């Protein structure tokens, strides 16, 4: 267990928006995956095991669903509840544009992803005035589509930790209409209204969504603490109840050095961490920040995958040298071992541990953290 920095900006493109997903962290509640798709989906997909929260870093396109179409672009969250048939397509990349790239948070415990209950009225379920976003910020599917077509259409269904292929003789999105409150939607992070304060505000004020045993937060461009003696960067701290995983999107994150778009920092439960040496002094007098990052805090330990270790910055724990707390060394860093490529630690799920063998998982979606 140690602090980590994954440099995923160099992750090569592969697969389609489903098969190209590479799980980098996971536990029995949620999995976090990266995807840089290289191919188009020629099939439809249904996740019957969990909700998906997709954050679009680069690229634009359309999610075709049984409820209609959702247009998406950079910095969009796309929420797809479990059981919804969909196909994700990206627009052609123009010269000078970044190739499509997105992050996926997928529930593994059967829970749903949605707004925090404290943002909603207990009487009406509407967003309250103090919430950092509201119903008008959510984009619903457009125009229920009717595909009165016959033929062979493949639908891949993720269930029981495997992906099963079914052939339909009619178009899977042949729906004439729908009602109710269970549907996919988009939310752009630029529509999130940050909560600011006189002194440093705690991370929960950045919360955007949550599932059982985890939360998703958005650190957006905002005004910084405005007390005359305020120190704008976070103070040194330990996460005693959670693992903290940040995906850096754009801007200048003042508390960290060596961070770039596509970086993932990981600070496990109990390990002290805080601003890098020199960043506190540089932050004094700052009025605003341009940072944009997506954070997932989990209330049970997250485990890195073998795939994640390919992007691990082994020198990251040493970046705090000179501060008052010791550099954390684990089995991969003791006695100079951090100078060599580290062999990934194999982790089994609770189910697998009981049976004494690795857990089988959906090969197509890259669920390999077990």
Question: Which residues make up each language-model segment?
Answer:
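Jelly-roll (double-stranded beta-helix
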Residues: 1-370
């Amino acid at each position: 267990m140690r602090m980590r920095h994954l440099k995923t900006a160099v992750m090569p493109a592969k697969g389609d928006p489903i098969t190209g997903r590479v799980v980098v962290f996971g536990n029995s509640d949620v999995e976090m995956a990266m995807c840089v798709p290289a191919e188009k989906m020629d099939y439809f997909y249904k996740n019957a095991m969990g909700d998906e929260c997709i954050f679009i870093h680069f690229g634009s396109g359309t999610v075709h669903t049984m409820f209609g179409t959702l247009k998406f672009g950079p910095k969009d969250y796309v929420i797809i509840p479990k059981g919804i048939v969909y196909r994700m397509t990206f627009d052609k990349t123009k010269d000078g544009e970044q190739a499509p790239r997105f992050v996926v948070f997928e529930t593994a415990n059967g829970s749903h992803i949605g707004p925090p209950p404290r943002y909603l009225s207990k009487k009406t379920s509407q967003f309250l005035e103090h919430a950092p976003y509201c119903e008008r910020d959510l984009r619903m599917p457009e125009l229920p589509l009717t595909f009165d077509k016959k033929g062979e259409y493949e639908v891949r269904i993720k269930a029981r930790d495997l992906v099963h292929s079914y052939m339909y003789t009619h178009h899977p999105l042949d729906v004439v209409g729908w009602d109710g409150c269970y549907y996919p939607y988009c939310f752009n992070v630029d529509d999130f209204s940050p909560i600011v304060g006189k002194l440093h505000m705690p991370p929960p004020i950045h919360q955007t969504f949550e599932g059982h045993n985890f939360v998703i937060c958005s650190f957006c461009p905002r005004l910084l603490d405005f007390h005359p003696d305020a120190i704008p960067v976070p103070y040194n701290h330990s996460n005693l109840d959670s693992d903290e995983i940040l995906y850096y999107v754009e801007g200048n994150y003042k508390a960290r050095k060596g961070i770039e778009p596509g970086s993932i920092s990981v600070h496990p439960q109990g390990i002290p961490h805080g601003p890098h040496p020199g960043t506190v002094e540089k932050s004094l007098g700052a009025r605003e920040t341009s940072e944009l990052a997506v954070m997932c805090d989990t209330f049970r330990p997250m485990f890195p995958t073998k795939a994640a270790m390919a992007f691990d910055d082994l020198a990251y724990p040493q970046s705090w040298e000179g501060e008052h707390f010791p550099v954390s060394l684990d089995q991969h860093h003791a006695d100079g071992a951090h100078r060599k490529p580290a062999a990934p630690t194999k982790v089994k799920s609770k189910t697998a541990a009981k049976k004494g063998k690795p857990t089988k998982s959906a090969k197509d979606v890259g669920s390999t953290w077990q």
